[in-house]
Amino acid sequence: MVPFSSGPILASSASTAAHCQHRITDTHHVPHRPLVNSLDRAQAAKNKGNKYFKAGKYEQAIHCYTEAISLCPTEKTVDLSTFYQNRAAAFEQLQKWKEVAQDCTKAVELNPKYVKALFRRAKAHEKLDNKKECLEDVTAVCILEGFQNQQSMLLADKVLKLLGKEKAKEKYKNREPLMPSPQFIKSYFSSFTDDIISQPMLKGEKSDEDKDKEGEVLEVKENSGYLKAKQYMEEENYDKIISECSKEIDAQGKYMAEALLLRATFYLLIGNANAAKPDLDKVISLKEANVKLRANALIKRGSMYMQQQQPLLSTQDFNMAADIDPQNADVYHHRGQLKILLDQVEEAVADFDECIRLRPESALAQAQKCFALYRQAYTGNNSSQIQAAMKGFEEVIKKFPRCAEGYALYAQALTDQQQFGKADEMYDKCIDLEPDNATTYVHKGLLQLQWKQDLDRGLELISKAIEIDSKCDFAYETMGTIEVQRGNMEKAIDMFNKAINLAKSEMEMAHLYSLCDAAHAQTEVAKKYGLKPPTL
């Protein structure tokens, strides 16, 4: 037998394989007992491979791990799975992702709960752009690790977001436009006080009113798609509004600017931002149009940009609206909401203050100012400021007892402060004021879970929300999330799919797809490996 060379290690594959074999079989170099069985020889090859691996000599390591695999008795499944996983690690260093995935698959077949192999295969699938397979593997890892490893959870979150965006991009452009519920539409328009198109029709505009002697009003009304659209709006016959506005626009009628803005608004409401933008652009460019119309179009385009995660464009539009119509309270109200989303609380409060100065009766702005101050105090853990904000809420609901939003925001703050009983009372007041507002029932249902761990009552309230408004995507999303926590994945997936079909933006749809894909991955992992996360 030729003794193992003490000279430099050769780079060729043949020499490397020989080194492994000679090291294993040459008993002159083994000070202890001879390597009498295959497993010992396999372990020795693996150990030699580990030394090559640590030295950054990955090709040589691969040959040693291959030798270990060929020597290992097939019944030694745990050892064999380790050798495959080690070889996968070496392939990973060489960025041979297909080989990494193949070796990890062998390792997992031999040892189904082998976390290291599952995670390495997940990373290989990520590199190979196999998102679904990556998600299933990293989901199994998260469950096996009890959701304690930040690295695997970050990968799961990353791939879920990528899958969500990918699916939403395809689905959203082909979705059927869906008109929201009347309650949602009324709530939307109630956030504006300087919006001409949402104001009640003036005397002489309705078709059932007396005509003037000249017959001029009659002619305008009969030919005005915009005035018909306004009448349909008052009748809550929302599905006909876009087509009537289009008639006014096509005819280049007297109310063309108003019709463009109203049509754009309803395009936004049905989630068709691509159709809304040209109409908004046109209104903004009409220098001769009423400045209130142009400012309102800027507010709505700015809000649209924010929904599309374009904060710079959004900020530009709000600032332009403030420049052209500085006395418009809506500009400051909606810009304040934007500032909260951007975590610019002091600027948000300043905007709400300006809105209140211009419209002292604006209950919404006062309630949202209190909530902004509360969030700032809560985040900064400033107890005196928290108390001041809570006192502010009390003053708002006393001054504006008919403002449901005031009670709802106060309830959220009370929940944070674990004043659950009082929060529940606030939600009840919301329901008294707006019995058709499904969102309030969802929040009250979530409160029951947090407060009393009363799952049945919570689900009952969320089911009530769906009964009241079958288009409430928030209710379906919440129900799906609860079902995931209960381990009812099929029901959860059904709820998420219903929410997906109701999503009002591509970004919202992407988030819902992420939730749905997470539930689906857990279902697949349960089937393959018998793994389930802890449930409620």
Predicted regions and their residues:
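Alpha-helical tetratricopeptide repeat
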Residues: 1-536
